[in-house]
Amino acid sequence: MSEYTNVAEIFGEDVFNDAVMQQRLPKKVYKDLKQTILEGKELSLEMADVIAHEMKEWAIEKGATHYTHWFQPLTGVTAEKHDSFITAPLPNGKVLMSFSGKELIKGEPDASSFPSGGLRATFEARGYTAWDCTSPAFVREDDGGAILCIPTAFCSYTGEALDQKTPLLRSMEAVQEQALRLIRLFGNTTSRKVKPSVGVEQEY
């Protein structure tokens, strides 16, 4: 008889989900991050530094040595730019492992390597990845080791979407804005967020 695996126990074990954040983050930081996720509140760099540190420590505990801003360019497949947590050797022969809030929030891959649909000229090819905190980070393991994957949006330096996720996020924001306006007309004054979802129909 094969060994029994309790799916409920292992489900999400490699995801930096709400349960992990609540356990590892200081209460104030956790509260501010939840407000950012639910209401779009701006997150300070100081708070981002704390989140990045705890995310790094959690990932290292799971064997990760690198992190990547994980995004969906217009190629039809995902893309990653890998960076190491190792920043400098120490005099005692050890190494320093660090990950800052700035590195968590923003990355700068070579946008000229990805299609843009003619949105910009080659000399304007600069692009940025921006952390999407509404999607949880996760650790992915393969033959090369474990890596912390941080879901991000990918935009040009002038704000044009260069990926498949940014238009989706902007559409969800627009739907939420109008849905909240509508439910206010029906007397609902307490709801702060509308979460659109779409799924395949049963007959599909």
Residue ranges of model-derived segments:
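Short, functional N-terminal and low-complexity linear motifs
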Residues: 1-3, 22-23, 54, 140-150
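Glycine-rich, acidic/polar active-site loops that bind/position phosphate-bearing ligands
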Residues: 125-203
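Histidine/acidic residue-rich metal-binding segments in metalloenzymes
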Residues: 3-15, 19-68, 72-100, 105-123
